[in-house]
């Protein structure tokens, strides 16, 4: 890479670190190209991205971001997985790490909070932002549904009473 390319790459990576909801750093030594391509496609499908960067350039890109505390993680062959949703990147990385022991999660960051490997693992167990929104909407809609049922119940009961009187009159 030429100097200008490196500057552009660092700037791009810096913007990624600033905009991402979460960042995960992992060792990937021993992961085959096919496995890495599979991992990248899974991450892309979930809405995240996987990048491999020189450690020195990644450390420079971290300067001036909230995630600056994770510079110590960049040793050896490291990859960076990130996503806008704070749960997506950790979830996909941990799922892939379960099936591939060559991928070792080192840690990561969520905003200004630096996470160790256990922190990333626990973050991966949380529901995604969309799932939380769906649960919240369900909780909000549940009382409205109950109110509608209660309001509609007397009308249906009244209709049954009228129907019973009509049948009684017909029988007599």
From Swiss-Prot:
The keyword Thylakoid does not apply. CDD domains: Ribosomal_L10. GO terms for cellular component: large ribosomal subunit. PROSITE patterns: RIBOSOMAL_L10. One of its GO terms (biological process) is translation. The keyword Ribosomal protein applies. One of its GO terms (molecular function) is large ribosomal subunit rRNA binding. Keywords: Ribonucleoprotein, Ribosomal protein, RNA-binding, rRNA-binding. InterPro entries: Ribosomal_uL10, Ribosomal_uL10-like_sf, Ribosomal_uL10_bac, Ribosomal_uL10_bac_type, Ribosomal_uL10_CS_bac. Belongs to the universal ribosomal protein uL10 family. Forms part of the ribosomal stalk, playing a central role in the interaction of the ribosome with GTP-bound translation factors. Part of the ribosomal stalk of the 50S ribosomal subunit. The N-terminus interacts with L11 and the large rRNA to form the base of the stalk. The C-terminus forms an elongated spine to which L12 dimers bind in a sequential fashion forming a multimeric L10(L12)X complex. PANTHER family: 39S RIBOSOMAL PROTEIN L10, MITOCHONDRIAL (PTHR11560). This is Large ribosomal subunit protein uL10. The lineage of its organism: Bacteria, Pseudomonadati, Pseudomonadota, Alphaproteobacteria, Hyphomicrobiales. The gene is rplJ.
């Amino acid at each position: 890479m030429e100097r200008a390319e490196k500057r552009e790459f660092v700037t791009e990576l810096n913007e990624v670190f600033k905009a991402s909801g979460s960042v995960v750093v992992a060792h990937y030594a021993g992961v085959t190209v096919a496995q890495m391509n599979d991992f990248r496609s899974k991450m892309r499908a979930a809405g995240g991205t996987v990048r491999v960067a020189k450690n020195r350039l990644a450390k420079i890109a971290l300067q001036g971001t909230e995630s600056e505390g994770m510079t110590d993680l960049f040793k050896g062959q490291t990859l960076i997985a990130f996503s806008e949703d704070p749960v997506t990147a950790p979830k996909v990385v941990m799922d892939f790490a379960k099936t591939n022991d060559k991928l070792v999660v080192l840690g990561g960051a969520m905003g200004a909070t630096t996470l160790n490997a256990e922190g990333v693992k626990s973050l991966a167990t949380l529901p995604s932002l969309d799932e939380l929104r769906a649960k919240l909407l369900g909780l909000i809609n549940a009382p409205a549904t109950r109110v509608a049922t209660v309001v509609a119940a007397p009308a249906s009961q009244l209709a049954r009473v009228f129907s019973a009187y009509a049948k009684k009159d017909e029988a007599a």
